[in-house]
Amino acid sequence: MYSLNPSQIEASNLLYQVSSVEVGKHLYWQLGMFQVHGQVLITSWVVMAIIIITSVIASRNLQPIPSGTQNFLEYVLEFIRDLTKTQVGEEEYRSWVPFVGTLFLFIFISNWSGALIPWRLIELPSGELAAPTNDINTTVALALLTSVAYFYAGLSKKGLSYFGKYIQPTPILLPINILEDFTKPLSLSFRLFGNILADELVVAVLISLVPLVIPVPMMLLGLFTSGIQALIFATLAAAYIGESLEGHH
């Protein structure tokens, strides 16, 4: 009978630890006829609370010469304003700063929460806590909100003539132009979801294999890529809105 030597047993144990890293474990809440992912709602509420509390603290005692939290908040708002102005256009950007800013801050803090907050230490009846953007439902919802926003932008400015863009520069391109508007939210959602999920899985696997050494630089890299993903999503959302306002691709 074949028996494993100690090195093979150790290798088997490591493989078992890696295989225990699962995707798709959820805590389901029943809301009427629908089942929702409870852990996503919990972490989303935490992220929204962080944004609201920070905003209230920074703006409760505004000073002509900003300092501390107010200074940081004004820097963030200036960055978001410049981003929106560049993508949407100087004439139309002001009304879209709150939308683009909310998208950016929610995604940014959600992504960072996955790397900085030890969600998995909090035990649930089933499933486990993770960054809200680690769930495809969250990223699809954000992408659909972006789709609604750029359709609203085009229709509010041009009315029904907005749909004339689908036959530009030639009616032959009608199916392709329609398909493009469907692929925009898909590309936004899958890009964000894939990057955040991959980052968390890589860190989880490395922690199971080398608990102390390798995961730290990978977590730092994850923080950087998480910020980049938030910037890409907000930039593309603003660019799509700008395209709708201009009336062409």
From Swiss-Prot:
Record-annotated disulphide pairs: none
Q: Spell out the Gene3D superfamilies in the cross-references.
A: ATP synthase, F0 complex, subunit A (1.20.120.220)
Organism for this UniProt entry: Chlorokybus atmophyticus (Soil alga)
Enumerate the UniProt keywords alphabetically. Answer: ATP synthesis, CF(0), Chloroplast, Hydrogen ion transport, Ion transport, Membrane, Plastid, Thylakoid, Transmembrane, Transmembrane helix, Transport
Q: Report the main location listed first in the record.
A: plastid
Source organism lineage? Eukaryota, Viridiplantae, Streptophyta, Chlorokybophyceae, Chlorokybales
Q: What Gene Ontology terms describe where this protein resides (cellular component)?
A: chloroplast thylakoid membrane; plasma membrane; proton-transporting ATP synthase complex
The UniProt subunit note reads as follows:
F-type ATPases have 2 components, CF(1) - the catalytic core - and CF(0) - the membrane proton channel. CF(1) has five subunits: alpha(3), beta(3), gamma(1), delta(1), epsilon(1). CF(0) has four main subunits: a, b, b' and c.
Which gene does this sequence derive from?
atpI
Protein name, per record: ATP synthase subunit a, chloroplastic
Free-text function comment from the UniProt entry: Key component of the proton channel; it plays a direct role in the translocation of protons across the membrane.
- State the PANTHER family in the record: ATP SYNTHASE SUBUNIT A, CHLOROPLASTIC (PTHR42823:SF3)
Location(s), subcellular: Plastid, Chloroplast thylakoid membrane
The UniProt GO MF terms for this protein read: proton-transporting ATP synthase activity, rotational mechanism
Bilayer disposition of the protein: Multi-pass membrane protein
